[in-house]
Amino acid sequence: MRQAEIVRETKETKVRLAVNLDGTGRASIATGIGFFDHMLDLLARHARFDLEVEAKGDLHVDFHHTTEDVGIVLGQAIRRALGDMRGITRYADLHLPMDETLTRVALDISGRPFLVFRTEFKVGKIGEFDTELVREFFQAFASNAGVTLHVETLYGDNAHHIAESCFKGLARALRAAVAIDPAAAGEIPSTKGALGG
């Protein structure tokens, strides 16, 4: 089974996260941040990962540390669950519509962390959630998953829809990229014979 569980504890947060890449989309999410829980729930559902997240953080300060640290741990867990990445599809790209919004996501599970994030929000908050934290989550995730990730919102007005299209786009790209390619016969999808840098 391609699964992993990680616990990360700092002076700012404690995060326990478990992921099963070959799941059914079941999610149990509790970060103390309602909007972020919603984004993680739909990420699990659309990636069809089973995902458990328990996070306790310094929410009295703001939501930054918790959001970033969950991104760190999710990235680490997916990287660990993939193992040597043998047989995976590796690449995925798609356009994700959410009402008036359209976001393009391209992903390479390469072992080389890089993020291009071209998404702008017209407001600073969605409820109590700072919209700048969407990028912080994606940066933390890409850096720790070891993936090259491009996220670009081509157009959109509603901040909730923009954020949701980014998370759903990541979910669908992950679902496609981690899928086992039956034609690859268990090969590592790289001419170098290894992924990881």
UniProtKB/Swiss-Prot annotation:
InterPro entries: IGPD_sf, ImidazoleglycerolP_deHydtase, ImidazoleglycerP_deHydtase_CS, Ribosomal_Su5_D2-typ_SF
Source organism, top-level taxon: Bacteria
Keyword annotations: Amino-acid biosynthesis, Cytoplasm, Histidine biosynthesis, Lyase
Catalytic function, reaction form: D-erythro-1-(imidazol-4-yl)glycerol 3-phosphate = 3-(imidazol-4-yl)-2-oxopropyl phosphate + H2O
EC annotation from Swiss-Prot or TrEMBL: 4.2.1.19
Molecular function as annotated in GO: imidazoleglycerol-phosphate dehydratase activity
Pathway(s) of this molecule: Amino-acid biosynthesis; L-histidine biosynthesis; L-histidine from 5-phospho-alpha-D-ribose 1-diphosphate: step 6/9
Any one of the GO BP annotations: L-histidine biosynthetic process
A family per Pfam: IGPD
An annotated GO cellular component: cytoplasm
Subcellular location: Cytoplasm
The family this protein is said to belong to: Belongs to the imidazoleglycerol-phosphate dehydratase family.
Protein name (database record): Imidazoleglycerol-phosphate dehydratase
